[in-house]
Amino acid sequence: MAAFADRPTCRVSLGAVFLARELHRLRKSLPLCVFSLFLFSFAFSALSGAPSQFAEAAMPKLSGEKLAELMQMDVKDIKERMLALFDLIDTNQDNTIDTEEAKEWSAKLKNAMHQHQVRMEFQAIDKDNDGKVSLSELEATYVDSLDQKQLEQHKKEVEQRFKTVDKDNDGLLDLSEIRILMDPGKDEGLMKIEIEEILNAQDKNGDRKITVTEFIETEGTGSLNDVEKTELEKEFKSYDLNADGAIDVEELQQIIKDPHSHEIRMLLEEFTKDLKDGKVGREQWEKEFESFAVSMLTDNGEVLRFPEDYSGIEFPFKTAVPQVDVDDEDKHDEL
Protein backbone atom coordinates (compact mmCIF):
# COMPACT_ATOMS: atom_id res chain seq x y z
CA MET A 1 0.00 0.00 0.00
CA ALA A 2 1.46 3.09 -0.40
CA ALA A 3 4.51 4.38 1.01
CA PHE A 4 6.33 7.65 0.65
CA ALA A 5 7.94 6.26 -2.45
CA ASP A 6 4.73 6.05 -4.35
CA ARG A 7 3.63 8.52 -6.92
CA PRO A 8 -0.12 9.20 -6.67
CA THR A 9 -2.21 8.52 -9.72
CA CYS A 10 -5.92 8.31 -10.35
CA ARG A 11 -7.81 6.09 -7.90
CA VAL A 12 -7.39 4.88 -4.39
CA SER A 13 -7.25 1.69 -2.43
CA LEU A 14 -7.03 0.44 1.15
CA GLY A 15 -3.45 -0.68 0.89
CA ALA A 16 -1.55 2.56 1.16
CA VAL A 17 -2.63 3.20 4.64
CA PHE A 18 -0.60 0.34 5.92
CA LEU A 19 2.83 1.81 5.25
CA ALA A 20 2.29 5.49 5.67
CA ARG A 21 -1.20 6.30 4.52
CA GLU A 22 -1.55 9.74 6.01
CA LEU A 23 1.89 10.96 5.05
CA HIS A 24 1.45 9.57 1.57
CA ARG A 25 -1.63 11.73 1.27
CA LEU A 26 0.08 14.81 2.65
CA ARG A 27 3.30 14.52 0.72
CA LYS A 28 3.96 17.62 -1.38
CA SER A 29 6.57 16.10 -3.63
CA LEU A 30 7.63 12.48 -3.73
CA PRO A 31 11.42 12.17 -4.02
CA LEU A 32 11.33 8.39 -3.97
CA CYS A 33 9.75 6.18 -6.53
CA VAL A 34 11.43 2.82 -6.29
CA PHE A 35 8.23 1.05 -5.30
CA SER A 36 6.04 2.63 -7.91
CA LEU A 37 5.25 -0.56 -9.84
CA PHE A 38 3.41 -2.50 -7.14
CA LEU A 39 4.77 -1.34 -3.83
CA PHE A 40 2.03 0.42 -2.08
CA SER A 41 0.77 2.72 -4.75
CA PHE A 42 -2.49 2.95 -2.86
CA ALA A 43 -4.35 5.34 -0.56
CA PHE A 44 -7.87 5.89 0.71
CA SER A 45 -10.32 7.64 -1.55
CA ALA A 46 -11.10 10.05 1.22
CA LEU A 47 -7.52 11.14 0.77
CA SER A 48 -5.73 10.96 -2.57
CA GLY A 49 -5.39 7.91 -4.66
CA ALA A 50 -3.71 5.39 -6.80
CA PRO A 51 -5.09 2.37 -8.65
CA SER A 52 -4.45 -1.09 -7.39
CA GLN A 53 -1.55 -2.51 -9.37
CA PHE A 54 -1.25 -6.05 -8.10
CA ALA A 55 -2.49 -7.27 -11.47
CA GLU A 56 0.51 -5.65 -13.09
CA ALA A 57 2.89 -7.75 -11.03
CA ALA A 58 2.63 -10.73 -13.35
CA MET A 59 5.68 -11.29 -15.50
CA PRO A 60 5.38 -9.20 -18.69
CA LYS A 61 6.48 -10.45 -22.09
CA LEU A 62 9.49 -8.46 -23.25
CA SER A 63 12.10 -9.15 -25.89
CA GLY A 64 15.74 -9.01 -24.88
CA GLU A 65 16.21 -5.90 -27.02
CA LYS A 66 13.25 -4.10 -25.47
CA LEU A 67 14.37 -5.05 -21.98
CA ALA A 68 17.88 -3.75 -22.67
CA GLU A 69 16.44 -0.50 -23.97
CA LEU A 70 14.26 -0.01 -20.91
CA MET A 71 17.03 -0.87 -18.46
CA GLN A 72 19.74 1.00 -20.37
CA MET A 73 21.90 -2.11 -20.16
CA ASP A 74 23.06 -4.62 -22.72
CA VAL A 75 21.38 -8.02 -22.96
CA LYS A 76 24.54 -9.93 -22.08
CA ASP A 77 24.99 -7.99 -18.83
CA ILE A 78 21.34 -8.47 -17.87
CA LYS A 79 21.58 -12.20 -18.45
CA GLU A 80 24.78 -12.52 -16.43
CA ARG A 81 23.25 -10.62 -13.54
CA MET A 82 20.14 -12.76 -13.66
CA LEU A 83 22.19 -15.95 -13.36
CA ALA A 84 24.13 -14.49 -10.43
CA LEU A 85 20.84 -13.49 -8.83
CA PHE A 86 19.45 -17.00 -9.22
CA ASP A 87 22.31 -18.33 -7.10
CA LEU A 88 21.54 -15.80 -4.36
CA ILE A 89 17.85 -16.72 -4.24
CA ASP A 90 18.40 -20.49 -4.48
CA THR A 91 19.59 -20.79 -0.90
CA ASN A 92 19.56 -24.59 -0.75
CA GLN A 93 21.44 -24.78 -4.07
CA ASP A 94 19.12 -27.35 -5.65
CA ASN A 95 18.97 -25.38 -8.93
CA THR A 96 15.34 -24.51 -8.24
CA ILE A 97 13.68 -21.46 -6.74
CA ASP A 98 10.61 -22.60 -4.82
CA THR A 99 7.80 -20.57 -3.30
CA GLU A 100 9.43 -20.30 0.12
CA GLU A 101 12.73 -19.08 -1.34
CA ALA A 102 10.88 -16.54 -3.49
CA LYS A 103 8.96 -15.32 -0.45
CA GLU A 104 12.04 -15.01 1.74
CA TRP A 105 14.00 -13.21 -0.96
CA SER A 106 11.19 -10.75 -1.68
CA ALA A 107 10.85 -9.92 2.00
CA LYS A 108 14.60 -9.35 2.17
CA LEU A 109 14.44 -6.97 -0.80
CA LYS A 110 11.54 -5.02 0.64
CA ASN A 111 13.14 -4.62 4.04
CA ALA A 112 16.38 -3.44 2.47
CA MET A 113 14.64 -0.95 0.20
CA HIS A 114 12.51 0.32 3.06
CA GLN A 115 15.64 1.27 4.98
CA HIS A 116 16.94 3.03 1.88
CA GLN A 117 13.66 4.92 1.57
CA VAL A 118 13.79 6.02 5.18
CA ARG A 119 17.25 7.49 4.74
CA MET A 120 16.33 9.23 1.50
CA GLU A 121 13.10 10.60 2.93
CA PHE A 122 14.92 11.85 6.01
CA GLN A 123 17.36 13.75 3.81
CA ALA A 124 14.51 15.22 1.78
CA ILE A 125 12.63 16.48 4.85
CA ASP A 126 15.70 17.78 6.72
CA LYS A 127 15.97 21.01 4.76
CA ASP A 128 18.67 22.62 6.92
CA ASN A 129 20.75 19.43 7.01
CA ASP A 130 21.20 19.51 10.78
CA GLY A 131 20.45 15.82 11.18
CA LYS A 132 17.06 16.47 12.80
CA VAL A 133 13.55 17.09 11.48
CA SER A 134 11.49 19.86 13.04
CA LEU A 135 7.70 20.13 12.94
CA SER A 136 7.96 23.03 10.52
CA GLU A 137 10.12 20.94 8.18
CA LEU A 138 7.63 18.08 8.33
CA GLU A 139 4.73 20.44 7.65
CA ALA A 140 6.59 22.06 4.77
CA THR A 141 7.04 18.64 3.22
CA TYR A 142 3.57 17.22 3.78
CA VAL A 143 1.19 20.17 4.03
CA ASP A 144 2.19 23.12 1.86
CA SER A 145 0.64 21.98 -1.40
CA LEU A 146 -2.80 21.23 0.04
CA ASP A 147 -6.02 23.15 -0.49
CA GLN A 148 -6.31 26.00 2.01
CA LYS A 149 -9.65 24.71 3.26
CA GLN A 150 -7.99 21.52 4.44
CA LEU A 151 -4.73 23.06 5.55
CA GLU A 152 -5.44 23.47 9.27
CA GLN A 153 -6.90 19.99 9.66
CA HIS A 154 -3.95 18.44 7.91
CA LYS A 155 -1.53 20.43 10.04
CA LYS A 156 -3.19 18.99 13.13
CA GLU A 157 -2.84 15.48 11.76
CA VAL A 158 0.85 15.99 10.98
CA GLU A 159 1.44 17.50 14.43
CA GLN A 160 -0.31 14.55 16.08
CA ARG A 161 2.00 12.12 14.31
CA PHE A 162 5.03 14.26 15.07
CA LYS A 163 4.29 14.25 18.79
CA THR A 164 3.57 10.52 18.77
CA VAL A 165 6.94 9.57 17.28
CA ASP A 166 8.98 12.22 19.14
CA LYS A 167 9.92 9.70 21.81
CA ASP A 168 12.46 11.86 23.65
CA ASN A 169 10.16 14.92 23.57
CA ASP A 170 12.90 17.22 22.33
CA GLY A 171 10.73 18.75 19.61
CA LEU A 172 12.84 17.18 16.87
CA LEU A 173 12.82 13.85 15.05
CA ASP A 174 16.00 11.89 14.46
CA LEU A 175 16.45 9.12 11.91
CA SER A 176 15.14 6.41 14.24
CA GLU A 177 11.98 8.42 14.89
CA ILE A 178 11.45 9.07 11.18
CA ARG A 179 11.79 5.33 10.71
CA ILE A 180 8.83 4.88 13.09
CA LEU A 181 6.88 7.51 11.18
CA MET A 182 7.29 5.51 7.99
CA ASP A 183 6.39 2.21 9.64
CA PRO A 184 3.32 2.82 11.83
CA GLY A 185 2.90 -0.88 12.54
CA LYS A 186 5.95 -0.75 14.79
CA ASP A 187 4.44 1.83 17.15
CA GLU A 188 1.23 1.29 19.11
CA GLY A 189 0.33 4.97 19.30
CA LEU A 190 0.86 5.59 15.61
CA MET A 191 -1.05 2.45 14.70
CA LYS A 192 -4.05 3.63 16.70
CA ILE A 193 -4.02 6.88 14.74
CA GLU A 194 -3.89 4.98 11.46
CA ILE A 195 -6.74 2.66 12.40
CA GLU A 196 -9.02 5.47 13.50
CA GLU A 197 -8.45 7.40 10.30
CA ILE A 198 -9.01 4.29 8.20
CA LEU A 199 -12.32 3.70 9.95
CA ASN A 200 -13.32 7.35 9.68
CA ALA A 201 -12.76 7.18 5.94
CA GLN A 202 -14.30 3.77 5.23
CA ASP A 203 -16.70 2.76 8.01
CA LYS A 204 -19.92 4.49 6.98
CA ASN A 205 -22.29 2.96 9.56
CA GLY A 206 -20.01 3.33 12.56
CA ASP A 207 -19.80 -0.35 13.51
CA ARG A 208 -15.98 -0.25 13.38
CA LYS A 209 -15.90 -2.67 10.48
CA ILE A 210 -15.48 -2.15 6.75
CA THR A 211 -17.81 -4.15 4.53
CA VAL A 212 -17.15 -4.86 0.88
CA THR A 213 -19.92 -2.40 -0.01
CA GLU A 214 -18.35 0.35 2.08
CA PHE A 215 -14.96 -0.46 0.63
CA ILE A 216 -16.15 -0.27 -2.97
CA GLU A 217 -18.26 2.84 -2.39
CA THR A 218 -15.31 4.66 -0.84
CA GLU A 219 -12.81 3.41 -3.39
CA GLY A 220 -14.89 4.16 -6.45
CA THR A 221 -14.61 7.56 -8.09
CA GLY A 222 -17.47 7.79 -10.54
CA SER A 223 -18.90 4.64 -12.01
CA LEU A 224 -16.84 1.46 -11.90
CA ASN A 225 -16.84 -1.04 -14.71
CA ASP A 226 -17.11 -4.76 -14.02
CA VAL A 227 -13.36 -5.32 -14.21
CA GLU A 228 -12.62 -2.55 -11.71
CA LYS A 229 -15.31 -3.78 -9.34
CA THR A 230 -13.99 -7.33 -9.54
CA GLU A 231 -10.46 -6.12 -8.76
CA LEU A 232 -11.74 -4.19 -5.74
CA GLU A 233 -13.64 -7.22 -4.49
CA LYS A 234 -10.50 -9.32 -4.86
CA GLU A 235 -8.48 -6.71 -3.01
CA PHE A 236 -11.06 -6.55 -0.23
CA LYS A 237 -10.91 -10.33 0.24
CA SER A 238 -7.14 -10.14 0.61
CA TYR A 239 -7.61 -7.86 3.64
CA ASP A 240 -10.54 -9.82 5.08
CA LEU A 241 -8.29 -12.42 6.67
CA ASN A 242 -11.01 -14.47 8.37
CA ALA A 243 -13.33 -14.27 5.34
CA ASP A 244 -16.31 -13.07 7.37
CA GLY A 245 -17.23 -10.34 4.90
CA ALA A 246 -15.80 -7.43 6.88
CA ILE A 247 -12.42 -5.92 7.70
CA ASP A 248 -12.32 -5.38 11.47
CA VAL A 249 -9.87 -3.65 13.78
CA GLU A 250 -7.92 -6.83 14.48
CA GLU A 251 -7.41 -7.43 10.77
CA LEU A 252 -6.32 -3.84 10.27
CA GLN A 253 -3.79 -4.27 13.06
CA GLN A 254 -2.37 -7.43 11.52
CA ILE A 255 -1.90 -5.84 8.12
CA ILE A 256 -0.45 -2.61 9.49
CA LYS A 257 2.05 -4.56 11.59
CA ASP A 258 3.34 -6.50 8.60
CA PRO A 259 2.33 -4.77 5.34
CA HIS A 260 5.06 -6.49 3.33
CA SER A 261 3.61 -9.90 4.16
CA HIS A 262 0.27 -9.00 2.62
CA GLU A 263 1.77 -7.55 -0.51
CA ILE A 264 4.23 -10.39 -1.01
CA ARG A 265 1.41 -12.91 -0.68
CA MET A 266 -0.52 -11.15 -3.45
CA LEU A 267 2.51 -10.85 -5.69
CA LEU A 268 3.53 -14.43 -5.08
CA GLU A 269 0.16 -15.62 -6.36
CA GLU A 270 0.75 -13.73 -9.60
CA PHE A 271 4.35 -14.84 -9.89
CA THR A 272 3.72 -18.55 -9.44
CA LYS A 273 0.42 -19.00 -11.24
CA ASP A 274 2.09 -19.86 -14.57
CA LEU A 275 4.95 -21.87 -13.07
CA LYS A 276 4.88 -25.65 -12.82
CA ASP A 277 4.41 -26.62 -9.17
CA GLY A 278 5.09 -22.98 -8.29
CA LYS A 279 8.81 -23.43 -8.93
CA VAL A 280 11.32 -22.18 -11.47
CA GLY A 281 14.46 -24.10 -12.37
CA ARG A 282 17.76 -22.65 -13.49
CA GLU A 283 17.18 -23.73 -17.10
CA GLN A 284 13.80 -21.98 -17.29
CA TRP A 285 15.22 -18.94 -15.48
CA GLU A 286 17.96 -18.61 -18.08
CA LYS A 287 15.70 -19.30 -21.04
CA GLU A 288 13.01 -16.83 -19.94
CA PHE A 289 15.32 -14.30 -18.28
CA GLU A 290 13.54 -11.37 -19.96
CA SER A 291 10.34 -12.09 -18.04
CA PHE A 292 11.96 -12.92 -14.72
CA ALA A 293 14.12 -9.77 -15.00
CA VAL A 294 11.05 -7.62 -14.31
CA SER A 295 9.39 -9.82 -11.70
CA MET A 296 9.00 -9.55 -7.94
CA LEU A 297 12.35 -11.33 -7.53
CA THR A 298 14.19 -8.37 -9.07
CA ASP A 299 11.92 -5.67 -7.62
CA ASN A 300 10.74 -5.13 -11.18
CA GLY A 301 14.31 -4.84 -12.45
CA GLU A 302 15.54 -2.36 -9.86
CA VAL A 303 17.91 -4.88 -8.26
CA LEU A 304 19.70 -5.36 -11.56
CA ARG A 305 20.13 -1.64 -12.10
CA PHE A 306 20.67 -0.25 -8.59
CA PRO A 307 21.93 -3.02 -6.29
CA GLU A 308 23.63 -0.57 -3.92
CA ASP A 309 20.24 0.75 -2.85
CA TYR A 310 19.45 -2.57 -1.17
CA SER A 311 21.44 -2.10 2.01
CA GLY A 312 22.61 -5.24 3.75
CA ILE A 313 22.45 -7.46 0.67
CA GLU A 314 25.75 -8.30 -0.99
CA PHE A 315 25.39 -8.51 -4.76
CA PRO A 316 28.19 -9.74 -7.07
CA PHE A 317 27.54 -6.77 -9.36
CA LYS A 318 27.28 -3.00 -9.05
CA THR A 319 25.13 -0.25 -10.50
CA ALA A 320 25.44 -0.36 -14.26
CA VAL A 321 23.51 2.75 -15.21
CA PRO A 322 25.30 6.10 -14.72
CA GLN A 323 23.51 7.90 -11.90
CA VAL A 324 23.01 11.48 -13.04
CA ASP A 325 21.89 14.25 -10.73
CA VAL A 326 18.15 13.74 -10.94
CA ASP A 327 15.28 13.06 -8.59
CA ASP A 328 14.90 9.48 -7.43
CA GLU A 329 11.59 9.46 -9.26
CA ASP A 330 13.52 9.74 -12.51
CA LYS A 331 16.29 7.44 -11.38
CA HIS A 332 13.91 4.67 -10.38
CA ASP A 333 11.34 5.01 -13.10
CA GLU A 334 8.88 2.26 -13.83
CA LEU A 335 9.73 -0.36 -16.37
UniProtKB/Swiss-Prot annotation:
Residues 113-148, 153-188, 190-225, 227-262 form the EF-hand domain. The lineage of its organism: Eukaryota, Sar, Alveolata, Apicomplexa, Conoidasida. It comes from Toxoplasma gondii. It is a single-pass membrane protein. This is Calcium-binding protein TgpCaBP. Gene3D superfamilies: EF-hand. Ca(2+) 3 binds at D203, N205, D207, K209, E214. Pfam families: EF-hand_5, EF-hand_7. The chain crosses the membrane at residues 30-50.
